[in-house]
């Protein structure tokens, strides 16, 4: 998951954008990019919204997989390029920037984290595949992210039960 903070001010938008890319065995199977419902007061708040939206998508797809008999492996990894987004999910008392609508999302994320449904993993922005979905990117950056996705897919394929033998 990823978010930008403040949207695209060239067009008068202050609403952040959430980008989500779900992968299975290194292959993206679901992605989306949406404006967030309200203006985030900080990049951490925007990241929490993105993480909660990502977990909603993950939960739905994992539930469907379980319903049709596909074994599901918890916890899932959420790649996050914002240290504050990882820190706030574990912090007991959110600061004033996360009051209101973010309290519900943060509480839900903490609950899922405590139930071992996901692990947030810090990843460099350059390697965050969802980064492409939050803002217009230069061709150079898009190519780099495409190569990173290919590398990730090959790495996962080598370690999976399907490939690498």
Give short role names for the model-derived ranges.
Residues 1-46:
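RNase H-like nuclease fold core
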Residues 37-165:
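RNase H-like nuclease module associated with reverse transcription
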